[in-house]
Amino acid sequence: MPTLIVLIGPTGVGKTELSLRLAENFHTSIVSADSRQLYAELKIGTAAPTPDQLKRVPHYLVGTLHLTDYYSAAQYEQEAMEILHQLFTEHEVVVLTGGSMMYVDAICKGIDDIPTVDAETRQVMLQKYEEEGLEQLCAELRLLDPDYYRIVDLKNPKRVIHALEICYMTGKTYTSFRTQQKKERPFRILKIGLTRDREELYDRINRRVDQMMEEGLLDEVRSVLSYRHLNSLNTVGYKELFKYLDGEWELPFAIEKIKQNSRIYSRKQMTWFKRDEEIRWFHPEQETEILEYLRLQNLTHLPSLDTF
């Protein structure tokens, strides 16, 4: 049966190298589940696969969009499922990897069939947000859809705005479209989670930020400065350096904030992933144990322990 190996874990844990090794040994491809690696302009700050890594293993949904392109989790689900359908005609196993929780869920569970927001409604809501602010939009959401108001992250403007767009466009609550029924997939899903001790993970995150700065992250941020108003750049590593370029923060302070916010994000990721009882957790260096786990799932064409 076609099998999707879903390799997940917090930022900086070491997903990239292990995903490459798995894909190489299964002679297959990698589909990205990273909402920021989609953008061609964002390479260093998103830890996108390097040219050498892209040569080692074919990757999909990396660098396919530009910053001005609108893209939703529902669009990701549709495009990724089309890619997987094609890949499974050629491979028994495909690897999906990334840390964007909603994108992983889009493939493993499916996205509710929520109407696509038309351009006019989107423009109206963005203008309301700019003129009235998030607090006023939250107040409107409380009146129009109190059930969703109670569970949504009220500090996330994208979520609040999208819910209001649906309310205004359809005359129905956003909640009424959220069936949250898991979709059946024509392939088996094996979820492998990577984790490290907190101190070890935080040290890796800190060192990775330093490496990004050495590789030219500041120049990359300068190159997208004119697009800073876009949601795609409301991203750790970019929003902090925007404040440095504005003269609001000193560079060392901005770098420390990137590290701090990356650590906070890693905790949010782990909180999300820990709710999923289907994930089997390993340390990234437990390659032998991971391979043995896959062997027990009756996968054929497994690499030998000696070559992995």
From Swiss-Prot:
Which chemical reaction does it catalyze? Answer: adenosine(37) in tRNA + dimethylallyl diphosphate = N(6)-dimethylallyladenosine(37) in tRNA + diphosphate
Annotated residues for binding of ATP: 9-16
Q: GO molecular-function annotation terms?
A: ATP binding; tRNA dimethylallyltransferase activity
- Interaction with substrate tRNA: region residues: 34-37
User: In the Enzyme Commission scheme, what number(s) does this protein have?
Assistant: 2.5.1.75
Note the Gene3D superfamilies from the entry. Answer: 1.10.20.140, P-loop containing nucleotide triphosphate hydrolases (3.40.50.300)
Q: Which InterPro entries does this chain map to?
A: Dimethylallyltransferase, IPT, P-loop_NTPase
Q: Which family does it belong to?
A: Belongs to the IPP transferase family.
What does the subunit section of this Swiss-Prot or TrEMBL entry state?
Monomer.
Protein's name according to its UniProt entry? tRNA dimethylallyltransferase 1
Lineage of the species this protein comes from: Bacteria, Pseudomonadati, Bacteroidota, Bacteroidia, Bacteroidales
